[in-house]
Amino acid sequence: AALYRIIAHYRMTDLIDTHISLRVPDQPDCFLINQYGVAFEKMRASTLVKINHEGQVVESYEQDKPVNMAGFVIHSAIHDAHPHLNCVIHTHTADGIAVSAQKHGLLPISQHAMKFYQHVAYHEYEGVALSTDEQERLIQDLGDHRAMILRNHGLLTAGETIARAFHEIYFLERACQAQVKALSGGAELHYPAEEVRIKTAKQFASPLIEPILQRAWQAALSLIEHQYTEYAS
């Protein structure tokens, strides 16, 4: 619930149409996802729904409240295929959609973008993800990456922890924002050398980054500390 509110704090919401999921630690075949229709800004622990990989509601504080079907299709596919990925975040931000619609995709023109150099996947748009038929292609396209650009649709990141998934979506979103602004200026872009791009990506992939992810998550969490009694209920 806190992660939903943090995503809202950073203005990465789209009414009620995006989703975040978290695997239940002692029930690996189940994950928590938002109750469809609740604004991210108002998310509480009690408005999360526990569902299994077949889409069956295992536990819900409010009975007969739906989950987003597209959310189930996308998130269950990733949780099922990648047992190590416990948190999945999907967004529809304006800049994320803009980059997803650009033929060249994400450009290595910022430090944020170079984190993903050769480490971001792409998935072609097939319409609203309401069919489980799309799951196999989604997983094939994701491969072993933690970040994926859904063409003409938005962004998706995943991680072993909430901190990792959040750091991925934050950096991917910032990379897209920088790209849209840079391209809108009309001037010729400067690209760092290939070896610098590779070096930067390796730096972000280093195990030494893990404590930084945790600190970043705690810093983000502190921004909504005053809402604790709400989102924890």
Q: What annotation goes with each model-predicted range?
A:
Residues 1-233:
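Glycine-rich flexible loops
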